[in-house]
Curated annotation (Swiss-Prot):
Protein family membership: Belongs to the polerovirus P0 protein family.
Protein name: Suppressor of silencing P0
Entry annotated with the keyword Magnesium: no
Source organism: Beet western yellows virus (isolate GB1)
Location of the F-box-like domain: 63-67
UniProt keyword terms in alphabetical order: Host-virus interaction, Inhibition of host innate immune response by virus, Suppressor of RNA silencing, Viral immunoevasion
UniProt lineage: Viruses, Riboviria, Orthornavirae, Pisuviricota, Pisoniviricetes
Length: 218
């Protein structure tokens, strides 16, 4: 597993050169996070024009997709499926939109925020229609009640789409929390305690500090 910083795009690329067990993947990612400050320092020494904020956003965008299943299950499973709406959520919150991707997992999202919001809107509307099928009685309680029901759903969708998709800030605090997360993941791998409630609570706290209070990723 290789971690490559691209000078042209100021981004991080994670290359998987061979099959690795899920614990190995988590252990290597933990090592990157644990040493992220040194990694960033080495990049800046090599290329002073390198934009670290973009690099960090590209890392934050990819991290949940690489870690998703591995953190919650010590049996080899497929990666968290990067469905379009999931990638759109991640992209809006991290402020990063990859134009292309390498490997078998496609992380591409449209470049504009409007396009990404439309993906999420379609997903929310699809979920609404599926749930609506289970409660058809909403159609038979009168127009006023249905209108009120639809208004509540619309306000909730708008709140999730705009208030819940604020772009998170990145900076020195991000490096500190990523290192803390890496240290915790190392402990979880070494002790094989992926289901320990205390450690999972600590993991949630680190995600909260990295991705924010309203973070969909958290």
């Amino acid at each position: 597993m290789q971690f490559v910083a691209h000078d042209n795009f100021h981004t991080l690329e994670v290359r998987k050169v061979r099959y690795l067990h899920s614990r190995q993947v988590t252990f290597l990612l933990a090592g990157l996070l644990l040493n992220i400050e040194q990694f960033v320092k080495a990049i800046k020494e090599r290329n002073n024009e390198f934009k670290i904020d973009i690099f960090l956003r590209s890392l934050l965008y990819q991290l949940p997709l690489h870690l998703g299943d591995h953190v919650h299950d010590d049996v080899r499973k497929s990666l968290l499926v990067p469905e379009p709406e999931l990638c759109a959520w991640f992209s809006l919150q991290t402020g990063y939109a990859p134009a292309s991707t390498s490997g078998r997992v496609n992380l591409y999202v449209p470049g504009t925020k409007t396009s990404r919001r439309r993906i999420i809107q379609r997903s929310l509307a699809s979920n609404f229609s599926e749930k609506f099928k289970r409660f058809p009685e909403c159609l038979f309680v009168g127009f006023e009640h249905f209108q009120r029901f639809l208004s509540i759903w619309t306000r909730d969708a708008e709140r999730r789409l705009f208030s819940g998709c604020r772009e998170i800030p990145v900076g020195s605090h991000t490096l500190v929390e990523l290192a803390n997360l890496g240290e915790l993941l190392r402990v979880m791998v070494a002790s094989e305690q992926f289901h320990n409630s205390r450690l999972l609570s600590r993991l949630a706290v680190h995600c909260y500090k990295i991705y924010g209070e309203d973070g969909f990723i958290s």
